[in-house]
Amino acid sequence: VDEHNAVRKACGVFDVSHMGEVLVSGPEAEKFVQYIFTNDIAGAPVGKIYYGMMLHENGGTVDDLLVYKMADDKFFLVINAANIDKDYAWIEAQAKAFDVVTENQSDTYGQIALQGPESEKVMAECLGLVCEDLAFYTFKTVDTEGETLIVSRTGYTGEDGFEVYGSHAYIQGAWGKLIAHGVKPCG
């Protein structure tokens, strides 16, 4: 109940580092992602995030995922933890018909989700990440502490919230700062 109340009334933090991340790049990156993804991303602006599914040819679900458009030729896919190996193998198999490079970066990134009505304020005060410019389902990259983070206004709690992707060292440090700031750990 304490975790629920923190997210509904203030702010809670979730360690979601178990999620998988796949980078797709190359001259046919948009064409490839359009092919494997159910949502229409053709001509999408850089900085936009889409939720949808990857489907088998018979219409069965491979997995649901988030697609981040990093550049016209670069996309960041966030897949479910239990399906990382299966999903990546499927993505690689589909990619053979396209001029793209796929990279499983699941071991590279850690991720925290800061959720609740005070999450924007806490992101700025505690982590120095100003996010008032982010609309829901958009992201930006932020250079801080010697690395580039991916910061998105996303989440599944029904409250305002943010997800931060960075090195495991950065995420561990951010977690410590948030807990020291009084943010409730959740999940």
Question: Where in the sequence are the language-model features?
Answer:
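Basic, glycine/lysine-rich polyanion-binding surfaces/domains
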Residues: 1-187
